[in-house]
């Protein structure tokens, strides 16, 4: 097996970062004709812009898992499509708040299988106390595992120390 990875990151103007990537896995382990198979590959692109205390970001990624039978149907995944957006604001040197929204869509090969998008919304707050940072994140998930009404909520409180 082998894999090829390509990526490009550029900062064309002050505050703007653009990135793109692609990977492809070459699978040689079974010794048979793989010409009809779907090989694993994926890619992503993203943009981030910072101006003063405000930062916004947007990204999209795709992943096609390896599949040995293109017309399997049923629940054989053709590809996943993920989209993320975020905004962060540094209120001052010690306090920052941010919001993130992510969506993941599953696409099946040749079936009528219904896939429900996974959706995630998260709010984060961090406060610096000199050598320590206290942070809290509240995240709501919908349709975990691409299953309808499989929802959850997480709250994470963390304290990190610099030594």
Regions found by a protein language model. Name each.
Residues 1-163:
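Outer-membrane beta-barrel proteins
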């Amino acid at each position: 097996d082998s894999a090829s990875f390509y990526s490009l990151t550029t900062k064309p103007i002050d505050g703007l970062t653009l990135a793109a990537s692609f990977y492809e896995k070459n699978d040689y382990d079974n010794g048979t004709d793989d010409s009809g198979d779907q090989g694993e590959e994926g890619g992503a692109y993203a943009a981030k812009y910072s101006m003063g205390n405000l930062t916004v970001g947007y990204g999209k990624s795709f992943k096609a898992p390896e599949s040995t039978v293109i017309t399997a149907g049923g629940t054989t995944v053709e590809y996943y499509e993920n989209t993320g957006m975020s905004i962060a604001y540094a209120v001052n040197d010690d306090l920052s708040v941010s919001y993130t929204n992510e969506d993941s869509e599953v696409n099946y090969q040749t079936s009528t299988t219904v896939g429900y998008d996974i959706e995630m919304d998260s709010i984060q707050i961090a406060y610096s106390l000199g050598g320590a940072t206290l942070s809290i994140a509240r995240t709501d998930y919908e349709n975990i595992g691409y299953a309808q009404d499989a929802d959850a909520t997480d709250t994470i409180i963390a304290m990190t120390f610099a030594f």
